[in-house]
């Protein structure tokens, strides 16, 4: 006798249900970690802290006339007048970049205040977006633009490409990632009338940027390089983040310190007209 064919589908809805539960738990855990870290930093920043230093406390690469910082909510509340006044062995801060947004759901809670008060202190300012590989690039661009009121005198917007937790899972989709990055850059340039810059570290530069986006200004992060930093394809860089351990008056936390490979006049020329 031929046995009847039995389709064992009874367990499929149950398996799908538990898969959804697993995905939801992972998402909630990730979201909780982000929120906990965010409010832990915010609570720390609410405490009074020392914001006066005798020097930058890091070795400054010689031969560069223009210096600046980049900050986020991890830098806590900033006294931009003190940042402007600091002078250590003739070195002053000429520009500051501030994280505005990350991915699709995080607006840096210090951004709005820093954006305004840095301008009042007559520090050249710029905003950057921390790119998340798993999020839609078009939506990320619109999210960034909706929170950054770029106007005449501001430095170009920056796309920060680094250390996304998901990047190792998506390396097989490198071509898609490059298309996504290009989409973000295109939308922001079209909306602001300014060509964005690309910030990245040497590892991400080698994997994603080398040989791509030749028309875009490069801001490279490298803490081990001495004197200067050389990109693997010898491409010119315009900004170099050489330390993440610097001190600066007006800021309680250690910060990122940068040099600009040009004159102050060339930096001014980058501003929005």
Indicate residue ranges for each PLM-predicted region.
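Glycine-enriched alpha-helix->loop->beta-strand junction motifs that scaffold or abut catalytic
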Residues: 88-93, 123, 153, 212-219, ...
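N-terminal Lys/Arg-rich, disordered targeting/topogenic segments
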Residues: 1-13
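Functionally critical loop-and-helix segments that line ligand-binding/catalytic clefts
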Residues: 41-75, 81, 205, 213-273
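Catalytic domains of cell-wall/extracellular-matrix polysaccharide-remodeling enzymes
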Residues: 155-233
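Substrate-binding cleft of extracellular glycoside hydrolase catalytic domains
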Residues: 47-183, 189-191
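Hydrophobic membrane-insertion alpha-helices, especially the h-region
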Residues: 14-34
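Short secondary-structure transition/capping segments
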Residues: 140-150, 170-183, 201-210, 237-254
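Sec-dependent signal peptide cleavage junction
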Residues: 34-40
